[in-house]
Amino acid sequence: MTTSSGSRIGGLLHASLFSLLGLGLLLAGGFKTVERYHFLRTAQEAQGTVSALNAGGSHPQIDFTSVSGERISYPQGGFIFGYQVGEPVRVLYEAGRPAASAIVDDAGALWGTGAFLCGFGALFGIVGFRGLLGLRSSQPTSKGH
């Protein structure tokens, strides 16, 4: 069975796009993970409290007071669930910008985004590279008459 030149080019384009998207997601996930690692090395910590549950509990409202006495309330995002109003939580933040950098000390909040990006990057990359390899192996061979 032969493939037409047009479908071959379309397959090459799709496989290349999946490969590039996968690589981009892997790089973004790696960058996010390294960034988080550096954040944890210098982060301040404070005790906080869950004051409300937003979006069905997947974005709890966290209240805490920084070391400098600033009172902060923010909605925590990320891959987290199961929090209850009034529950104490450990909050990590950068001393110079506590409101913008605060994050609950929870594996899903800390590492979820990086893991998600890397996981989808690997998936897209594998699909793309397998597509490229499949196109390469399906090339007609010339017998040199």
Swiss-Prot record:
Compartments where located: Membrane
Domain of life: Bacteria
Gene ablation phenotype (knockout): Deletion mutant together with deletion of toxin Tse4 leads to a significant loss of fitness advantage when placed in competition with parental strains.
Presence of keyword Ribonucleoprotein: no
Transmembrane found in the keyword field: yes
A Gene Ontology cellular-component term: membrane
Protein name, per record: Immune protein Tsi4
Record lineage: Bacteria, Pseudomonadati, Pseudomonadota, Gammaproteobacteria, Pseudomonadales
Membrane topology: Multi-pass membrane protein
Job of this protein: Immunity protein that plays a role in preventing early activation of toxin Tse4.
